[in-house]
Amino acid sequence: MGAEKRINDEEAQPLTGRDRSRDSIDSTSTASISLALIDQANRSTHAGRTTPPRNFGNGEKYRDNDDDNPEGGLPPPSGAQRTPKKVSIIFWLVAALCVGGWLVAFFVFMGSPKKDSDKEVVVSGAENSTVPGVVSTGGKKVDLDGVLTGFWSPRSHEISWIPGPDGEDGLLLEQDGDENAGYLRVENIRNQKSTNKKDDAVVLMKRETFKVGARRVRPSKVWPSPDLKTVLVMSDRLKNWRHSYTGNYWLFNVETQTGEPLDPGSPDGRIQLASWSPKSDSVVFTRDNNMFIRNLSSKDVKPITTDGGVNLFYGIPDWVYEEEVFSGNSATWWDNDGKFVAFLRTNESRVPEYPVQYFIPTVGRVAHAGEEHYPNTRKIKYPKAGAPNPTVNIQFFDVEKGEVFSIEMEDDLPDHDRLIIEVIWASNGKVLVRETNRESDRLSMVLVDAKDRTAKVIRSQDFSKLDGGWIEPSQSTYFIPADPGNGRPHDGYIETVPFEGFNHLAYFTPLDNPSPVFLTSGNWEVTDAPSAVDLKRGLVYFVAAKEQPTERHVYTVRLDGSDLQPIVNTKAPAYYTISLSTGAGYALLKYEGPEIPWQKVISTPANEERFEETIENNTELAGRAKDYALPSLYYQTITIDGYTLPVVERRPPNFNPDKKYPVLFHLYGGPGSQTVSKRFKVDFQSYVASNLGYIVVTVDGRGTGFIGRKARCVVRDNLGHYEAIDQIETAKAWGKRPYVDATRMAIWGWSYGGFMTLKTLERDAGQTFQYGMAVAPVTDWQFYDSIYTERYMHTPQNNPAGYANTAVSNVTALGQTVRFMVIHGTGDDNVHYQNTLTLLDKLDVDNVGNFDVHVYPDSDHGIYFHNAYKMLHERLSDWLVNAFNGEWVKIRNPVPNKSLMRRARSLLKRMSNA
């Protein structure tokens, strides 16, 4: 699932400001009408003498982070005239009755009994992560332009580590515009400190462009061959889905500095994927959903498959596998010897289509003559929950024999109930295939022998019996080859598996051994691990949330599970990531917060040759942090029903504990996700705190990641239930704080966060949160894709009650909030616009009207099309300001001013005659 550039430094004027002299339906509150009545009475009593009205719109803009007028009182009327005592008493009596009635109703609304009041809630800690040099209380306010245009994004460098042709370690691929040194070159990390970039560099491409016939080719992406003699080049890249694209592909000869088409017979063909043989002698690629192979010794291209098309995919994933399983565009795997290619065959024949309509003419959307003014419709094979899934099988191509074959296995999952989530080549023609059932709670590890053409299940696990949870797809299983002389008599693999309630590293050896050696254990979790393995020294490198769920540090452990050691400082709060060289002797170490991020290239502890070089310290960003008034971050935990959950509170600069601040809750909350972390980040939430002066709180509730499987798995079959309770209980706890205005609380989120916003408002029914903003929300999980949804909900056929509970259906409860807003892009191929339309229909049926909706034509899930991203955030900001300024309270029950005035005058007349 999936998201987050102009408004000026001053807060926008309330959107509901109107000319009070208009004879129309107005949004004026009862209290405002009472004051207006008094002014009218004054004017009528003193015929011919005008009393200026109160200055409701004097051009000054209210800010919650300004302390000039803590009471927020209205200025006195100018030039007020005296009124006869009897009339004044009557008028003031009427005004008092009106105001009193309004206040009574308001406090009854705010003080009504709360749901879930019996919950055990404990808030712990108030650690201020603010450190000198990162957060300043003075300076300029964070503006929206800066947040949305990358002004606050840390500079970051990626290193493409590559193995040397002879096994050299510490080699990296450099690609830049320095044609003096060479556009594309391989450098030894040891020479990075040299002022002469040509030192020991192997130049692969001298210039950025090259000619093939009359055509000039400019690379979009490049992949050097393992022997570094040829470069596979993609040009003219066109995006498909989130991770996939097509392009024209070329082979560039390093020695001659010349290029040729990958397929000389079809140089303009749009290729979907291409990958090198480990021997550098051939390339396999997919075009028009069929696979081909080109041997470099010939210009001939040979087909591997021929029946690919609209419903059959070879070597690439379809939409749902790209989005929910592989998180990438490849379903092709070469074996280590270059003798076999494994690839996914995907059959979508039974998968229903979903039409995504595009209404705005743009470049690239070609219409037939006479159809230019009709929407363009793209039909996607999209399996919704409970609908038929694509059927997937692993097939193999024998490179030497030129034949495709499949391997049957006894006790395999049936086609309709099989997900293939990972493929890992071992040695000697053996391959590991991780499979799960459709509902992702039964795992099978299959060992396939491509040489003998046999297959067997070597390990299985039922997660529904283990802890009621599920298997998340990942691509991090690591093959460990046998090395008898180094204490490894058999092949094996490392996988992240559940152990005593937390995700840990397990080493399985031999390959068919179902009982592993656990390399890590404890009440903490490893993340997408291992990062790398030093096979010579038997060291496993991994990243873990060991010190705190909100932090990441880097560790090593030996293959026997001994000597777990950090390689970074674990005493200070930090969030690290790491990318290791192919031999694990060097690493790109990234420090991502909470202070200003930096990057270093280092030698790893086992490397006897010491090396360290800072390649980015973000000096410019550090200067900006000093010049701007950034919010202060307070990391805490809250315990709800025995579950300890991480919370971060963003306080405005110059925070005044004697003031009452509005609070905005921001959340995502999807299963296994994490929003509360100690990364340095200046985002929309930072803008809200710094510029608008509101407190922003985020709590990672039950179901989120790195707090243990018990807290994570409790949400299964009932998404949105416990997560909503956690948001509400946290908001109640914050509402009791002396510096929080509990009458001004809002919540917002995008995607799963949009769903959670609506579910929280639905459960809360206006008792805690008065406002909400939901962007691209799921409103019924039967509308979302099968693989993601059924992992957490089972199928609708097996869990009908759960799906009914998770749908946003109690719109009457939504009607009890002051106001909420829903935003969606009509071209969303991920969370379909159908979700919002269905919710709007439910609101219409139940006559609920306290909401706003904004639709962005042709925008997908990221909402970028035609300035949409910038406008969306401006809309969120303006809407929130109006909410916390009380504008939406004023328009809850609009009454024509003229009618109300007439009734008031009639009442006054009767009172005068009494």
UniProtKB/Swiss-Prot annotation:
InterPro entries: AB_hydrolase_fold, Peptidase_S9_cat, Peptidase_S9B_N, Serine_Prot_S9B/DPPIV. It is found in: Vacuole membrane. It catalyses: Release of an N-terminal dipeptide, Xaa-Yaa-|-Zaa-, from a polypeptide, preferentially when Yaa is Pro, provided Zaa is neither Pro nor hydroxyproline. Its main location: membrane. Residues 26-38 have a biased composition (Low complexity). The chain crosses the membrane at residues 89-109. Residues 1-88 are cytoplasmic. GO terms for molecular function: aminopeptidase activity; dipeptidyl-peptidase activity; serine-type peptidase activity. Keywords: Aminopeptidase, Glycoprotein, Hydrolase, Membrane, Protease, Serine protease, Signal-anchor, Transmembrane, Transmembrane helix, Vacuole. Residues 1-82 are annotated as: Disordered. One of its GO terms (cellular component) is plasma membrane. It is an enzyme of class 3 (hydrolase). Residues 110-914 are vacuolar. Glycans are attached at N128, N295, N347, N617, N810, N897. It is a single-pass type II membrane protein. It holds the Pfam family Peptidase_S9. It comes from the Eukaryota. Type IV dipeptidyl-peptidase which removes N-terminal dipeptides sequentially from polypeptides having unsubstituted N-termini provided that the penultimate residue is proline. PANTHER family: DIPEPTIDYL PEPTIDASE 10, ISOFORM B (PTHR11731:SF200), PROTEASE FAMILY S9B,C DIPEPTIDYL-PEPTIDASE IV-RELATED (PTHR11731). Belongs to the peptidase S9B family. This is Probable dipeptidyl-aminopeptidase B. It comes from Uncinocarpus reesii (strain UAMH 1704). The gene is DAPB.
